[in-house]
From Swiss-Prot:
<dbReference type="GO" id="GO:0004497">
    <property type="term" value="F:monooxygenase activity"/>
</dbReference>
<keyword id="KW-0456">Lyase</keyword>
<keyword id="KW-0479">Metal-binding</keyword>
<dbReference type="GO" id="GO:0019253">
    <property type="term" value="P:reductive pentose-phosphate cycle"/>
</dbReference>
<feature type="binding site">
    <location>
        <position position="209"/>
    </location>
    <ligand>
        <name>Mg(2+)</name>
    </ligand>
</feature>
<feature type="binding site" description="via carbamate group">
    <location>
        <position position="206"/>
    </location>
    <ligand>
        <name>Mg(2+)</name>
    </ligand>
</feature>
<feature type="active site" description="Proton acceptor">
    <location>
        <position position="180"/>
    </location>
</feature>
<feature type="binding site">
    <location>
        <position position="299"/>
    </location>
    <ligand>
        <name>substrate</name>
    </ligand>
</feature>
<dbReference type="InterPro" id="IPR036376">
    <property type="entry name" value="RuBisCO_lsu_C_sf"/>
</dbReference>
<dbReference type="InterPro" id="IPR033966">
    <property type="entry name" value="RuBisCO"/>
</dbReference>
<dbReference type="GO" id="GO:0000287">
    <property type="term" value="F:magnesium ion binding"/>
</dbReference>
<comment type="function">
    <text>RuBisCO catalyzes two reactions: the carboxylation of D-ribulose 1,5-bisphosphate, the primary event in carbon dioxide fixation, as well as the oxidative fragmentation of the pentose substrate. Both reactions occur simultaneously and in competition at the same active site.</text>
</comment>
<comment type="subunit">
    <text>Heterohexadecamer of 8 large chains and 8 small chains.</text>
</comment>
<keyword id="KW-0503">Monooxygenase</keyword>
<feature type="binding site">
    <location>
        <position position="208"/>
    </location>
    <ligand>
        <name>Mg(2+)</name>
    </ligand>
</feature>
<dbReference type="InterPro" id="IPR036422">
    <property type="entry name" value="RuBisCO_lsu_N_sf"/>
</dbReference>
<feature type="site" description="Transition state stabilizer">
    <location>
        <position position="338"/>
    </location>
</feature>
Length: 488
């Protein structure tokens, strides 16, 4: 869509910098002929202009307000390399099937950003434009981060390959569970849950997002009892085990204190919540790199701005930022569980975490090729309302580089926690064996599980309890280029 001549950039310097108010496109924030440079940061926004606001002018406003513009002409622009520093909206297209919405592509010169700082990147890209009155709504759908910029970040402290080597576990997804109930248990009872899950065959057990240091269980007690459980389970099974010790706290000083204690106890992994903020995430990532500890990221709070299709930030962008910031594990959705997630869209999140180069794929919501410049890969985590009866779907959708976390699907087992873990481990090993034998696990999966359940009572009980449980609701965040998929 080209700019109307009436709002094209004013080339005459006297008119362009005369005191007063100009349209953003007139100030140069729209350039339909611009060809992005390899070093540009590119952003794709979904915008819904107010009635009567031209889509091109709205796109130019987004470019302006996320770079150098203000509401009026300022002569101090002439003291800068304004033409270079000015972000440029260079393409606008209607969103398929969404009247009144437009995709707009914006290019930013690399010099606008501080190296290695997600806080600075987000302050520009999302810092101001989402409250801008000429827009009814605005959503950041995707970004292309140039190699020159990616190389300024350290990325995951461990990565998938090294994690598997440390754990000595290959060729299958990792298994986990979140301790339930998430709040209220004493330290000793909490540790017993951890032990039972690990003894039954899980690789990890996990603190939930809101278990920190409350009156019913001080964080130090939790760490001590959990690591006692980990060590006991390791000794009895001969496998490396772990528990995601949540070190989220009110200050960085306290987070470091908890991380140091976790390391002293021999933990291979610590956990933080997304809500601690970008600077805290990058800081604790650096600590994990220096101390050879895995960093598990719980995406607590993301749904407040990622779920609605018209306004906010797509989770694929959050996943890109977190890979730069440096996390080893990231909750990325299940598609078949209780939480929001269209299957193809969720696969796009996984691609962002695990690929060396993420290719454009509109059906999965990916609008740009992204070269990760050798950054280590993030292990995606599927968690939330999944059970053993869905094992074939999960492996078919996500492959083997994933942590499958069955919280209620382990701890809610009718024969106890250890039986729940056994059911999940047997279902996993059975499905991986079937896959390796060349069977069609997507279609034969239920039959394969039923056959395995004949000789595994815990799996049979799990299938009897949850085999018919599904969460088939229409997703709110889906690709605009395909209908909502179903995995039922």
């Amino acid at each position: 869509m080209g700019a109307d001549a009436a709002i094209g950039q004013i080339k005459d310097a006297k008119k362009r910098y005369a005191a007063g108010v100009l349209k953003y496109a007139q100030m140069g924030y729209w350039d339909g002929d611009y060809q992005p440079k390899d070093t540009d940061v590119l952003a794709l926004f979904r915008i819904t202009p107010q009635d009567g606001v031209d889509a091109v002018e709205a796109a130019a406003a987004v470019a302006g307000e996320s770079s150098t513009a203000t509401w009026t002409v300022v002569w101090t622009d002439r003291l800068t390399a304004a033409d270079m520093y000015r972000a440029k909206a260079y393409k606008v297209e209607p969103v398929p099937g969404q009247p009144g919405q437009y995709f707009c592509w914006v290019a930013y010169d690399l010099d606008l950003f501080e190296e290695g700082s997600i806080a600075n990147l987000t302050a520009s890209i999302i810092g101001n434009v989402f409250s801008f009155k000429p827009l009814k709504a605005c959503r950041l759908e995707d970004m292309r981060l140039p190699v020159a910029y990616v190389k300024t970040f350290r990325g995951p402290p461990t990565g998938i390959v090294v994690e598997r080597e440390r754990l000595d576990k290959f060729g299958r997804p990792l298994l986990g569970a979140t301790t339930k109930p998430k709040l209220g248990l004493s330290g000793k009872n909490y540790g017993r849950v951890v032990y039972e899950g690990l003894k039954g065959g899980l690789d990890f057990v996990k603190d939930d997002e809101n278990i920190n240091s409350q009156p019913f269980m001080h964080w130090r007690d939790r760490f001590l009892y959990c690591m006692e459980a980990v060590n006991k389970a390791q000794a009895e099974t001969g496998e490396v085990k772990g528990h995601y010790l949540n070190i989220t706290a009110g200050t960085m000083e306290e987070m470091y204190r908890r991380a140091e204690f976790a390391k002293e106890l021999g933990s291979v992994v610590v956990m933080v919540d997304l809500i601690v903020g970008w600077t805290a995430i990058q800081s604790i990532s650096n600590w994990c790199r220096e101390n050879d500890v895995l960093l598990h990221m719980h995406r607590a709070g993301h749904g407040t701005y990622t779920r609605q299709k018209g306004h906010g930030i797509s989770f694929r962008v959050i996943a890109k930022w977190l890979r730069l910031a440096g996390v080893d594990h990231l909750h990325t959705g299940t598609a078949v569980g209780k939480l929001e997630g269209d299957p193809m869209t969720v696969q796009g999140y996984y691609n962002v975490c695990r690929e060396t180069v993420t290719k454009t794929d509109y059906t999965r919501g990916i609008f740009f090729d992204q070269d990760w410049a050798g950054l280590r890969k993030v292990m995606p985590v599927a968690s939330g309302g999944i059970h053993a009866g869905q094992m074939h779907q999960l492996i078919d959708l996500f492959g083997e580089d994933v942590v499958l976390q069955f919280g209620g699907g382990t701890i809610g087992h009718p024969d106890g926690i250890q039986a729940g873990a056994i059911a999940n481990r047997v279902a996993l090993e059975t499905m991986i064996l079937a896959r390796n034998e060349g069977r069609d696990i997507k279609n034969e999966g239920p039959e394969i599980l039923i056959e395995a359940a004949k000789w595994c009572r815990p799996l049979r009980a799990a299938l009897d309890t949850w085999g018919e449980v599904t969460f088939n609701y229409a997703s709110t965040d889906t690709s605009d280029f395909v209908p909502t998929a179903s995995v039922a």
